[in-house]
């Protein structure tokens, strides 16, 4: 069953390639959705797919790309929207 999760990634996560790395990982996992930087320094991700793939993305987010320092990952389940792509938003 398809689910949609919202991730808020806190730490040193902007300007380190987090969004593009996240997009690649999400596509590898067969997920749809988007990722963007927020003005407060947080990275927001909304991803949609099966629970196992979403959990794998969560595990990846806890580490992030090598240049990132992840302090905390906040997660919430949100309504499925039916996206069929994964985009980097500005």
Curated annotation (Swiss-Prot):
One family from Pfam that matches here is Acylphosphatase
Q: What is its EC number?
A: 3.6.1.7
| Acylphosphatase-like domain segment(s) | 4-90
Q: Which GO terms describe its molecular function?
A: acylphosphatase activity
Q: Which UniProt keywords apply?
A: Hydrolase
Give the annotated active site: 19, 37
Highest taxon of source: Bacteria
Its recorded reaction(s) are: an acyl phosphate + H2O = a carboxylate + phosphate + H(+)
Q: Which InterPro entries match?
A: Acylphosphatase (IPR020456), Acylphosphatase-like_dom (IPR001792), Acylphosphatase-like_dom_sf (IPR036046), Acylphosphatase_CS (IPR017968)
Record's PANTHER family? ACYLPHOSPHATASE
The record's comment on protein family reads:
Belongs to the acylphosphatase family.
- Name of the featured protein: Acylphosphatase
The beginning of the lineage is: Bacteria, Bacillati, Cyanobacteriota, Cyanophyceae, Synechococcales
